[in-house]
From Swiss-Prot:
Positions of short motif Nuclear localization signal: 30-34
Keywords of this entry: Eukaryotic host gene expression shutoff by virus, Host cytoplasm, Host gene expression shutoff by virus, Host mRNA suppression by virus, Host nucleus, Host-virus interaction, Inhibition of host innate immune response by virus, Inhibition of host interferon signaling pathway by virus, Inhibition of host PKR by virus, Inhibition of host pre-mRNA processing by virus, Inhibition of host RIG-I by virus, Inhibition of host RLR pathway by virus, Interferon antiviral system evasion, RNA-binding, Ubl conjugation, Viral immunoevasion
Protein name listed in UniProt: Non-structural protein 1
Gene: NS
Task of the protein: Inhibits post-transcriptional processing of cellular pre-mRNA, by binding and inhibiting two cellular proteins that are required for the 3'-end processing of cellular pre-mRNAs: the 30 kDa cleavage and polyadenylation specificity factor/CPSF4 and the poly(A)-binding protein 2/PABPN1. In turn, unprocessed 3' end pre-mRNAs accumulate in the host nucleus and are no longer exported to the cytoplasm. Cellular protein synthesis is thereby shut off very early after virus infection.
Amino acid sequence: TVSSFQVDCFLWHVRKRFADQELGDAPFLDRLRRDQKSLRGRGNTLGLDIETATRAGKQIVERILEEESDEALKMPASRYLTDMTLEEMSRDWFMLMPKQKVAGSLSIKMDQAIMDKNITLKANFNVIFDRLETLILLRAFTEEGAIVGEISPLPSLPGHTDEDVKNAIGVLIGGLEWNDNTVRVSEALQRFAWRSSDKNGRPPLPSNQKRKMARTIES
């Protein structure tokens, strides 16, 4: 905690020097002011002097930079992971008992006529820093290959976080399990998006959470 505060103080100082040269835009300056207030509060909580912490942070950053190669300074590129084939992504499907919910910038659809099925969630998405960056499409498949649910970004509301996707997955799972379906999550989704499945890939949702999620779909 102390070393994190020290590094944050030094990086704030670097950004302040940048702003002093009138190079920062309005959002940059706004973040600078907000971060200054935050650092003062953290300094009071930790009982640390900001100026002293800034010097210590400078030493930490300099030590890191001495050990870094130019290759290590490059921003990592995102990876595209695919659970579904192009045919599975582009296939049309219909619902006997359609239910639809908009959660933030994500659309959730499911067929609530589906009962007592084994269902697997598959998705195609981008990953960066070992976390889901952008969901392209998620679909729920029965063992027979039928599509019974879907999560997709809304074109009119771009931008979503991995937490948004996780919440949407929870809503979809809750709605499907309400009808006594067994839902499993693909290995890629377990690793990068859901992160709460058991060893068999089945997300353990308590019954009260299932009911809450099902009501969310119905509303």
